[in-house]
């Protein structure tokens, strides 16, 4: 690998690599913790030298704080000495007796694994920077949230929304290709079940387990099996516009419908029913409305279900699956916008005290594990092509964020066999985007948000990537042409 490309690869996947490879993560954390402790020792000595009156109590506090720092520094130094820079970054270091002794002295009663990496992870969790500063009475003051910080929060929220939207579209694309069934449901909360819902923090988790096990039974499998290969879901919370009442929109994607599922329009003169009764009764806290999602070439048509009609008796307009996917993502965008609203605004609209308790909680978008992250393997691609895919933009693929994440994961695996010192030699400087933008605002009279952020990130247009990278996107079926269709109608109703 060329030196320039290798440096760019490490810079591109640095955050992924430190999260994936235990040896590299520990080396970085040991270095950061060593710098932190040295800085705290300096601050402690400076504070002591500035004391005008030293009584016995002050000296005792100083001695205990100094002893605490010495214990932590001894553990950090010993762990640093055990790191083998010649070993690969995915290597796991065996335990050392002295490290174990120091760890048990600092973290008594805390269990740890069979490697030094697991012991170090437990130490960092038990003693974060905030706790050490609290013990030394050196807590950092809360930073003021200025215009830059508020703008960065909005940008992060927008990025999360776009990422979830792309994951939903990709998951539904994969489920359609596999011939799965789509069910759109709305979960509500009944007044007489609000107390039971408030008392059960795992109500939603239990509901999705119930549906997953129903699918397993329909396939003749044990309910103890994992249902990730036959059932996927997305759940988006929403607050009603009129009264602020909490409810959820759910998309079920199942390989096999639960037992008892049948065409609701079979034998009817007017085929205007779409509810699937086999999904009802699984949510014990209110009402549900599970609706079969119908579109062109769906699994229901292959199963022989009749095509439904609308309220006027006309056959429903046939849309491609992409339209359904884009329609579902509007709920994700809407929920993201609603997070900006204050909880008090929701509570003002709500007259039920039990519902007001629900509104105090923070409900997030829930989904199956690794929802929408599946793409064709990138193991055969070169590091140069992977680096290009990790920098693509929307005009190359509407699922550009998923492509970028998968490319970075593959690059992270590719560099896993390299020695630690080779990676650390090209370690990138981690800069704070917040501080960088603040500095640019002071230097630039006419500051532009978008151009400044764009200049800090490397992105490639469709014409800038190689033919091999472009061919991968085409073969994966995720080009803008493949995902062009958008929804123009509502897929709800009976």
Swiss-Prot record:
One of its GO terms (biological process) is DNA replication. The active site is at 327 (o-(5'-phospho-dna)-tyrosine intermediate), 331 (o-(5'-phospho-dna)-tyrosine intermediate). It holds the Pfam family Phage_GPA. One of its GO terms (molecular function) is DNA binding. The keyword Hydrolase applies. Keywords: DNA replication, DNA-binding, Endonuclease, Hydrolase, Metal-binding, Nuclease, Viral DNA replication, Zinc, Zinc-finger. A zinc finger (unnamed) spans 230-252. InterPro entries: Replication_gene_A-like. The A protein is a specific endonuclease that cleaves the viral strand of supertwisted, closed circular DNA at a unique site in the A gene. The A protein also causes relaxation of supertwisted DNA and forms a complex with viral DNA that has a discontinuity in gene A of the viral strand. This is A protein.
């Amino acid at each position: 690998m060329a030196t320039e490309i290798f440096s760019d690869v490490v810079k591109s996947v640095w955050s992924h690599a430190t999260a994936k490879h235990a040896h590299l993560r520990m080396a970085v954390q040991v270095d950061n913790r060593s710098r932190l402790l040295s800085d705290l020792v300096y601050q402690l000595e400076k504070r002591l030298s500035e004391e005008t009156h030293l009584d016995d109590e002050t000296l005792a506090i100083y001695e205990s704080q100094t002893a605490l720092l010495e214990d932590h520094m001894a553990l950090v130094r010993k762990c640093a000495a055990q790191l083998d820079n010649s070993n690969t970054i995915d290597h796991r270091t065996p335990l050392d007796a002295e490290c174990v002794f120091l760890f048990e002295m600092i973290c008594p009663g805390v269990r740890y694994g069979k490697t030094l990496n697991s012991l170090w992870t437990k130490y960092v969790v038990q003693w974060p920077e905030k706790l050490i500063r609290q013990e030394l009475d050196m807590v950092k003051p809360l930073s003021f949230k200025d215009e830059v910080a508020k703008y960065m929060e909005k940008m992060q929220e927008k990025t999360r929304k776009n990422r979830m939207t792309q994951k939903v579209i990709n998951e539904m694309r994969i489920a359609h290709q596999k011939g799965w069934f789509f069910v759109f449901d709305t979960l509500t909360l009944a007044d007489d079940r609000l107390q039971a819902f408030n008392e059960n923090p795992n109500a939603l988790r239990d509901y999705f387990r119930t549906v997953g096990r129903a699918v397993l039974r329909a396939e003749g499998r044990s309910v103890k099996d994992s249902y990730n290969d036959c059932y996927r879901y997305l759940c988006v919370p929403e607050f009603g516009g009129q009264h602020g009442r909490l409810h959820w929109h759910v998309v079920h994607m199942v390989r096999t419908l639960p037992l008892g599922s049948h065409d609701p329009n079979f034998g009817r003169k007017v085929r205007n029913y779409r509810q699937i009764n086999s999904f009802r009764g699984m949510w014990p806290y209110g009402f549900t409305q599970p609706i079969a999602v119908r579109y062109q070439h769906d699994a229901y048509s292959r199963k022989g279900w009749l095509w439904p009609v609308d309220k006027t008796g006309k056959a429903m307009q046939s849309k491609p699956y992409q339209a359904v996917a884009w329609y579902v993502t509007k709920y994700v965008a809407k929920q993201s916008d609603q997070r900006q609203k204050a909880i008090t605004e929701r509570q003002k609209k709500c007259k039920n005290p039990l519902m007001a308790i629900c509104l105090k909680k923070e409900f997030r978008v829930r989904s199956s594990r690794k929802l929408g992250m599946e793409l064709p393997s990138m193991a055969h691609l070169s590091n140069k092509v992977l680096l290009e895919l990790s920098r693509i933009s929307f005009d190359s693929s509407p699922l550009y964020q998923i492509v970028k994440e998968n490319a970075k994961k593959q690059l992270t695996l590719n560099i896993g066999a390299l020695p630690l010192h080779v990676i650390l030699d090209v370690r990138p400087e981690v800069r704070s985007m917040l501080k960088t933008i603040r500095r640019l605002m002071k230097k630039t009279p006419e500051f532009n948000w978008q151009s400044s952020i764009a200049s800090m990130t490397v992105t490639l247009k469709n014409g800038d990537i190689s033919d091999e990278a472009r061919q991968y996107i085409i073969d994966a079926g995720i080009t803008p042409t493949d995902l062009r269709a958008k929804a123009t109608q509502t897929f709800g109703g009976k």
